[in-house]
């Protein structure tokens, strides 16, 4: 995943580790790494009619940009709290770091998961990932049906994922609430595809009919990228 990460200070190696790890990492931190908003590889309107240019512009320039800004702010505050030995402030900042950091991680994957139809978006998966989907779900159509059902049924805001368990070497459908990244469901899970089911991802175009958004997003899904991630992880 090509993220434009600005390493303005020393690296802080969290926040999405296992139980107890975020605080331990914070306690030993000597600096932070801020992040920047990644560029899109296509124009805002390139995914129409599946996703409108207006939605893409707002989603990228406003929503994702806000997660980036708030994550960086929280990391700066964390650095100050650690330097002062303020354990209470460190604990309080964990929620903001997880939410905004998760928002940045999830959206950075999401943009890579999309591709204009003219550039191959929507073409079904081939090769090893295609075979894995057939083996674990029965067919590509069955996978789409399951992800649509899981995404439509997700209460509130969140994400529906096609995940690879790199230990079991199986693909599965997972959901996460709010901006929780997939790794919070299991350290061995790697995101292949993520679909944002927050209302900001579809409401301006599809209103409250989330299933229509889910049905149409497959027309611009970048299965080539998902297949490359799958093969690289299992190489």
UniProtKB/Swiss-Prot annotation:
Targeting presequence: 1-31
Catalytic activity of the protein: 2 superoxide + 2 H(+) = H2O2 + O2
Keywords tagged on the record: Manganese, Metal-binding, Mitochondrion, Oxidoreductase, Transit peptide
Cofactor(s) the protein needs: Mn(2+)
Function: Destroys superoxide anion radicals which are normally produced within the cells and which are toxic to biological systems.
PANTHER family found in the cross-reference section: SUPEROXIDE DISMUTASE 2, SUPEROXIDE DISMUTASE [MN], MITOCHONDRIAL
Entry similarity comment: Belongs to the iron/manganese superoxide dismutase family.
Complexes and interactors: Homotetramer.
Protein name (database record): Superoxide dismutase [Mn] 3.1, mitochondrial
Source organism per UniProt: Zea mays (Maize)
């Amino acid at each position: 995943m090509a993220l434009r990460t600005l390493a303005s200070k020393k690296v802080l190696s969290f926040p999405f580790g296992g139980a107890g790890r975020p605080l331990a990492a914070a306690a030993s931190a000597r600096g932070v790494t801020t992040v920047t908003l990644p560029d899109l590889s296509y124009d805002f309107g390139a995914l129409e009619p599946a996703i409108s240019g207006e939605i893409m512009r707002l989603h990228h320039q406003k929503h994702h940009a806000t997660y980036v800004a708030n994550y960086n702010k929280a990391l700066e505050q964390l650095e100050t709290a650690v330097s002062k030995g303020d354990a209470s402030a460190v604990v309080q900042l964990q929620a903001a770091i997880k939410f905004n950091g998760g928002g940045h991680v999830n959206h950075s994957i999401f943009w890579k998961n999309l591709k204009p139809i003219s550039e191959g978006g929507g073409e079904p998966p081939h090769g090893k990932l295609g075979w894995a989907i057939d083996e674990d779900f029965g067919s590509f159509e069955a996978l789409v049906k399951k992800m649509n059902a899981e995404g439509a049924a997700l209460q509130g805001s969140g994400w529906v994922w096609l995940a690879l368990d790199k230990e079991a070497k199986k693909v599965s459908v997972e959901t996460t609430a709010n901006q929780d990244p997939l790794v919070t469901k299991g350290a061995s899970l790697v995101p292949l595809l993520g679909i944002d089911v927050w209302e900001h991802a579809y409401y301006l175009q599809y209103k409250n009919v989330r299933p229509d958004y889910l049905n149409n997003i497959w027309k611009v899904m970048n299965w080539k990228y998902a297949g490359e991630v799958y093969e690289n992880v299992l190489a």
